[in-house]
Amino acid sequence: MKWLIFGNKGWIGSMVSKILEQQGEQVVGAQSRADDESAVEREISEIKPDRVMSFIGRTHGPGYSTIDYLEQSGKLVENVKDNLYGPLCLAFICQKYNIHLTYLGTGCIFEGQNNFSADEKGFTENDKPNFFGSSYSVVKGFTDRLMHFFDNDVLNLRIRMPITIEQNPRSFITKILSYSRICSIPNSMTILDQMIPVMIDMARNKTTGTFNFTNPGLVSHNEILSLIRDIHKPNLTWENMSREQQLAILKADRSNNLLNTDKLQSLYPDVPDILTGIREVVSKMKFQQ
C-alpha cells in the first residue's frame, strides 16, 4: 500500500512514517505544500496513493516553543494558512479523488471546569468548540468544525498534549520537566507510542469521521512528575502555580479539558487508560543521572 505523508519530516509525521516503513508499507513524503492546491492535486495525481495522511500545522516557530508564537503581530496569515486552509485543501482534493485522508487535528478546542473529575463524561465528537483563549485554538476549532463536512472521507483525530517515551522538545513530559513552575490541572492526553499503531490501523481500515484520540481518563502534571520522581529522579522538585499566575506569564490562555473516548473505545477497547499508559511510559524512559 502506498502512503503519501504531508508533514513527514515533522515530529509526529516522522514517527508515523518510520512505523509504516517497518510494517513494509511504501511511504512517500509529500513535496507540495498543502496550501498550494494545484501542486497538491498534481502530486496526488502522479503518486496515486492509497492513503494520504496530514501532520501539518503551526504550533511553534522561531523564538517560541509553544503556540504563543501565533500571538505575535503578523502571524494571522501563517496561522490560517497552516492550520485551516492547508488541511481543508487536502480534504477537498482527497474527496475529489476518493482517497482516504487522515488528518491529525487537536482537542485543544474545549474548556472544561478546572475541577472536573474522571467520572464526568467529557466532551464528545459532536460537541462544538467552546475555547477561544488562543489564536491557535480559534482557528483549529473552526478547522475541526469544517472537517465534520467530510465525515465519509476524512479521519479527523483530536489529540492532546502528546507524549512519547523518547524525550523530545515537543513531548509534553519533556516540556514540563524544563519548567520551574507548573500549573497542574487534570487533562486528557495522547501517548503517541500507544496510539500511533491505532491511527495506522484506522487509516488502513478506511475509518472516517471525528474521533477524540486520547488515552481514556485524566492525568495531571503533578501525577506525571511524581511518577518520574518515584521511579527515576528522587531529587526532582517543582513548584506549583495557579491558573492566574500562569496566565500572567503566557501570551495566550491554554485549553484544559476531558475528552470522551467512548467512540474510540468501541472500536479499540484495549487502548490503555491514561494512568496505566503514563506508568508504562515513565518506566521505560531514560534519564541522565
Swiss-Prot record:
This is Uncharacterized protein L780. SUPFAM superfamilies: NAD(P)-binding Rossmann-fold domains. GO terms for biological process: S-adenosylmethionine biosynthetic process. It comes from Acanthamoeba polyphaga mimivirus. It holds the Pfam family RmlD_sub_bind. PANTHER family: DTDP-4-DEHYDRORHAMNOSE REDUCTASE, METHIONINE ADENOSYLTRANSFERASE 2 SUBUNIT BETA. GO terms for molecular function: methionine adenosyltransferase regulator activity. InterPro entries: dTDP_dehydrorham_reduct (IPR005913), NAD(P)-bd_dom_sf (IPR036291), RmlD-like-bd (IPR029903). GO terms for cellular component: methionine adenosyltransferase complex.
